[in-house]
Swiss-Prot record:
Coiled coil: 376-629
Major location category of this protein: cytoplasm
Biased composition (Basic residues): 399-414
Biased composition (Low complexity): 256-268
Domain Kinesin motor as annotated: residue spans: 10-365
GO BP of this protein: microtubule-based movement
Record lineage: Eukaryota, Metazoa, Chordata, Craniata, Vertebrata
Family to which this protein belongs: Belongs to the TRAFAC class myosin-kinesin ATPase superfamily. Kinesin family. Kinesin II subfamily.
Protein name from the UniProt record: Kinesin-like protein KIF3C
Biased composition annotated in UniProt, kind: Gly residues: 269-284
Keyword terms, alphabetized: ATP-binding, Coiled coil, Cytoplasm, Cytoskeleton, Microtubule, Motor protein, Nucleotide-binding
Function statement: Microtubule-based anterograde translocator for membranous organelles.
GO CC, one annotated term: cilium
Annotated ATP binding sites: G97, Q98, T99, G100, T101, G102, K103, T104
Length: 793
C-alpha cells in the first residue's frame, strides 16, 4: 500500500468527462461513458457492440464526472504537486484528449469567474499565497511561455513570435531552449499579464468540433527559486520548475474539418474556451497542422508505450520536439499529472477508447523525482550576490567622514567609480599626501573621505554643498583679490560643485538599482495580517486533509474489491452441492466474462496494430515517392560537380538529428569584403550546362553560345570591276532611263523588312556574279546591285 502511494505521488493519471453539448443532444447522440467517482473507474460502452459484448472498464487514480468542479480537480490532484514544486521538485501537468473535450478549459478555464478558473490561474494564486505566508525565505519567480506549431518552437512572449527557436541539450542541466525569454514576476497580476500576452499570439482555429481549437501545443513554464538559511549558517537554494502543458487534440480529419474554407491558424485573443484539436480540410493549412499535431502525439504515445513496457532499451524522445521537452516529465526527474479528457457522446467512441488506452499505459511509467538543491546556474544566487555588492558600495558611499591628518599637500586625482555604476562615471576626489616627519618618505595617497558611522551620504553631501556655496560667496565678497584670481577660484569652486553633483547622481542611481534588484526578491511574511494568514492556512490544511482522506478511501475500496475476489477463490467449504454449484457457476460466469473482455481487448489491439502499420506503410510509400522524384531531378538537371559541392557541405546535427548545410562563410570569418564573382570551371565567363556545351561543340543554334554569337563570312578579295556600256536607245531617251531607275528603286523598297535584314550584306561579299548577258548598266543600276543580288539569292 505504501509503495503504491509513493508511486502515485510521482505520476498520477486522472480522467475527466464533460457533459453532452447541445449540438450532440440535438443530433440524438447517447451517452456511452459511466464515471464511478468513488472507485476511480471509467466504463465505456460500445454503441455498435454485438449482443453479449461487455463494456470496457479502466481504473485511474481519480475520476471526475460532468458535475465535478474546477476546485475539486485542483485541490485533490494538483495542489500536492504545486507544494512539491515549492519544495524544489520538478512538476508537470498536461491534459490529453480529443478536440472539444475540455483540455484548455481544464488548464485555463474562465479567468473572470473564480469558480471556473482552471489549473493555471489556481496555480498562480497558490504559489504567491505560499510565498506571502512563508517566513525567513527569499523567492524568485520567473515565467516563460512557448508553443510548438508544426514542429517549430516559438516564443509567445518575444517581440518576434514567429521566430523559430533551437532546442539544445546540456549534460548537466538537460534539455533547454536557446534564447527563450523569461520574465521575473512579483505577484499574481504580473504573471497573469504575462500569460495573457502569450495567449494573444497563440495559434488557434475553428473546426466543426470546436470553434476555438488549439492548433499548437502550448507550455507555460514557471521557475521558483527559494533561498533559506540552513542549520549550518549557509544559504541553501532550491529550484522548482513547473510545466503547465495544453496539448492540441488528435482525431480524424473528416470529423473536424474547418468551418471556413481553410486558411492558416490565427492568434488567440485570450484564455478560456474549449479544448484544442487538429482539424483537417481540403485546403489551407489545416491538413498540415493536423498531420504535425498527430505526428507529435503519436511520438508521445510511443514514448509512453516504451516507458510502460519496461522492456525497451531505447526511448524515442527525439522523435518530436514535444517529447524532448517533456523528457524529464516522462520517466525522469519530475512529478507528473496527466488529465485525460473524454467526450461522452456515442460518435466519439473510437477517440475516447484511444484516450483511455493511452492513459492506462501511462499509469505504468515510473518517475524518479528529486529535490533540485544548490544548483550552479540559479538566478536567485546571482541576484543575491549583486544585491550584496551594491549594498557594500552604498555603505561605502553613505557612511563618509573625515580622518584626522597632519600636514598635507592637496592635489586632485581622478578616481574611477566602483564597478556596477551605469556608464562608469568618473568622480574627482581630493587626495591628501601625508608627510612623514621622521624619514621624509611619502606614504601612498589615501582619500580624505572615508567610511564613518556618524554621518550618512545625504547629510555629508548637503554639508559639502553648503560649505562650497559659502566659500564661493566669500570669494565674491573679497575685494582684495584680483579679478583674474577671483575668477580662477570661482571656476575651481564651480568645478568642485559639479563633481559633488555628479557623485550625488551616481549614488542615487546606485541606490535605485539596489532597490530595484531587492524588490524582485519576494520575502515571505510581509504586508499580510498574521491572524488572516493563520486562518487561511488552517483552512487549506483542512482542505488537504479532506482530499487526502478521499484519496485513501478510494484506494481502500479498490483494495477491498481485490481482497473480495481473492477470498472468493479461497472459499472451499460448502453446506450442500447446490450451494457449491451456484458458487462455481457464478465464478465461472465471471471468469468467462473476463475471458471475453481479454479476447475483445486483444482483437482491438490487433486492429489498432494493423491500422498503425497501414499508416506507417502509407507514410513510407509517400516518402519513397518523394525521394525518387528528388533523385530523378538531381540526376537529370543538376551537374555532377554541383551535386558534389552540395554533398560536401552536408553534415549531421546530432542534437536535432537532422542533416544541415555548412555555411558558405565559416563562422568567425568577416564577410564584409566584396568577393570577386566566381568564374566558370571550364573557362567561360558564366556557368554553362552540359547540354549547352555539347550543342555548342556541334555548332548548332547560336542560343547555346556564350560568346561569338554572330559569325560573319568576310571576303577579303578586291571587288569586281565591270565595264559600263551605254546603249544607243538610253542615250537618246534619258526619260526612259530615269523611269527604269525609279521602278527598280520602288521594287527594292517594297521588300519585307526581314528579307532586307537577312540579305543585308555588301555587294563585295556576294558569292554570285551578275549574268554575262548584262552588257550595259547605268550608274543607277550599279548603285542598285544589292537588290539584284538579293533577287538571285
Amino acid at each position: 500500500m505504501a509503495s503504491k502511494t509513493k508511486a502515485s505521488e510521482a505520476l498520477k493519471v486522472v480522467a475527466r468527462c464533460r457533459p453532452l453539448s447541445r449540438k450532440e443532444e440535438a443530433a440524438g447522440h447517447e451517452q456511452i461513458l459511466t464515471m464511478d467517482v468513488k472507485l476511480g473507474q471509467v466504463t465505456l460502452r460500445n454503441p455498435r457492440a454485438a449482443p453479449g459484448e461487455l463494456p470496457k472498464t479502466f481504473t485511474f487514480d481519480a475520476v471526475y464526472d460532468a458535475s465535478s468542479k474546477q476546485a475539486d480537480l485542483y485541490d485533490e490532484t494538483v495542489r500536492p504537486l504545486i507544494d512539491s514544486v515549492l519544495q524544489g521538485f520538478n512538476g508537470t501537468v498536461f491534459a490529453y484528449g480529443q478536440t472539444g473535450t475540455g483540455k484548455t478549459y481544464t488548464m485555463q478555464g474562465t479567468w473572470v469567474e473564480p469558480e471556473l478558473r482552471g489549473v493555471i490561474p489556481n496555480a498562480f494564486e497558490h504559489i504567491f499565497t505560499h510565498i506571502s505566508r512563508s517566513q525567513n525565505q527569499q523567492y524568485l519567480v520567473r515565467a516563460s511561455y512557448l508553443e510548438i506549431y508544426q514542429e517549430e518552437i516559438r516564443d509567445l512572449l518575444s517581440k518576434e513570435p514567429g521566430k523559430r527557436l533551437e532546442l539544445k541539450e546540456n549534460p548537466e542541466t538537460g534539455v533547454y531552449i536557446k534564447d527563450l525569454s523569461s520574465f521575473v514576476t512579483k505577484n499574481v497580476k504580473e504573471i497573469e499579464h504575462v500569460m495573457n500576452l502569450g495567449n494573444q499570439t497563440r495559434a488557434v482555429g475553428s473546426t466543426h468540433m470546436n470553434e476555438v481549437s488549439s492548433r499548437s501545443h502550448a507550455i507555460f513554464i514557471i521557475t521558483v527559486e527559494c533561498s533559506e538559511r540552513g542549520s549550518d549558517g549557509q544559504d541553501h537554494i532550491r529550484v522548482g520548475k513547473l510545466n503547465l502543458v495544453d496539448l492540441a487534440g488528435s482525431e480524424r480529419q473528416n470529423k473536424a474539418g474547418p468551418n471556413t474554407a481553410g486558411g492558416a491558424a490565427t492568434p488567440s485573443s485570450g484564455g478560456g474556451g474549449g479544448g484544442g484539436g487538429s482539424g483537417g480540410g481540403a485546403g489551407g493549412e489545416r491538413p498540415k497542422e493536423a498531420s504535425k499535431i498527430n505526428l507529435s502525439l503519436s511520438a508521445l504515445g510511443n514514448v509512453i508505450a516504451a516507458l510502460a513496457g519496461n522492456r525497451s532499451t531505447h526511448i524515442p524522445y527525439r522523435d518530436s520536439k514535444l517529447t524532448r521537452l517533456l523528457q524529464d516529465s516522462l520517466g525522469g526527474n519530475a512529478k507528473t499529472i496527466m488529465v485525460a479528457t473524454l467526450g461522452p457522446a456515442s460518435h466519439s467512441y473510437d477517440e475516447s477508447l484511444s484516450t483511455l488506452r493511452f492513459a492506462n499505459r501511462a499509469k505504468n511509467i515510473k518517475n524518479k523525482p528529486r529535490v533540485n538543491e544548490d544548483p550552479k546556474d540559479t538566478l536567485l544566487r546571482e541576484f543575491q550576490e549583486e544585491i550584496a555588492r551594491l549594498k557594500a558600495q552604498l555603505e561605502k558611499r553613505g557612511m563618509l567622514g573625515k580622518r584626522p591628518r597632519r600636514k598635507s599637500s592637496r592635489r586632485k586625482k581622478a578616481v574611477s567609480a566602483p564597478p556596477g555604476y551605469p556608464e562608469g562615471p568618473v568622480i574627482e576626489a581630493w587626495v591628501a599626501e601625508e608627510e612623514d616627519d621622521n624619514n621624509n618618505n611619502h606614504r601612498p595617497p589615501q582619500p580624505i573621505l572615508e567610511s564613518a558611522l556618524e554621518k550618512n551620504m545625504e547629510n555629508y553631501l548637503q554639508e559639502q554643498k553648503e560649505r562650497l556655496e559659502e566659500e564661493k560667496a566669500a570669494i565674491q565678497d573679497d575685494r582684495s583679490l584680483v579679478s583674474e584670481e577671483k575668477q580662477k577660484l570661482l571656476e575651481e569652486k564651480e568645478k568642485m560643485l559639479e563633481d559633488l553633483r555628479r557623485e550625488q547622481q551616481a549614488t542615487e542611481l546606485l541606490a535605485a538599482k539596489y532597490k530595484a534588484m531587492e524588490s524582485k526578491l519576494l520575502i515571505g511574511g510581509r504586508n499580510i495580517m498574521d491572524h488572516t494568514n493563520e486562518q487561511q492556512k488552517m483552512l487549506e490544511l483542512k482542505r488537504q486533509e479532506i482530499a487526502e482522506q478521499k484519496r485513501r478511501e478510494r484506494e481502500m475500496q479498490q483494495e477491498m474489491m481485490l481482497r473480495d475476489e481473492e477470498t472468493m477463490e479461497l472459499r472451499g467449504t460448502y453446506t450442500s452441492l447446490q450451494q457449491e454449484v451456484e458458487v462455481k457457476t457464478k465464478k465461472l460466469k465471471k471468469l468467462y466474462a473476463k475471458l471475453q473482455a481479454v479476447k475483445a481487448e486483444i482483437q482491438d489491439q490487433h486492429d489498432e496494430y494493423i491500422r498503425v502499420r497501414q499508416d506507417l506503410e502509407e507514410a513510407q510509400n509517400e516518402q519513397t515517392r518523394e525521394l525518387k522524384l528528388k533523385y530523378l531531378i538531381i540526376e537529370n538537371f543538376i551537374p555532377p560537380e554541383e551535386k558534389n559541392k552540395i554533398m560536401n557541405r552536408l553534415f549531421l546535427d546530432c542534437e536535432e538529428e537532422q542533416w544541415k548545410f555548412q555555411p558558405l562563410v565559416p563562422a568567425g570569418v568577416s564577410s564584409s569584403q566584396m568577393k570577386k564573382r566566381p568564374t566558370s570551371a571550364v573557362g567561360y565567363k558564366r556557368p554553362i550546362s552540359q547540354y549547352a556545351r555539347v550543342a555548342m561543340a556541334m555548332g548548332s543554334h547560336p542560343r547555346y553560345r556564350a560568346e561569338n554569337i554572330m559569325f560573319l563570312e568576310l571576303d577579303v578579295s578586291p571587288p569586281a570591276v565591270f565595264e559600263m556600256e551605254f546603249s544607243h536607245d538610253q542615250e537618246q531617251d534619258p526619260r526612259a532611263l530615269h523611269m527604269e531607275r525609279l521602278m527598280r528603286l520602288d521594287s527594292f523598297l517594297e521588300r519585307p523588312s526581314t528579307s532586307k535584314v537577312r540579305k543585308s550584306r555588301s555587294w563585295c561579299q556576294s558569292p554570285q556574279r551578275p549574268p554575262p548577258s548584262t552588257t550595259h548598266a547605268s550608274l543607277a543600276s550599279a548603285s542598285l546591285r544589292p537588290a539584284t543580288v538579293a533577287d538571285h539569292e
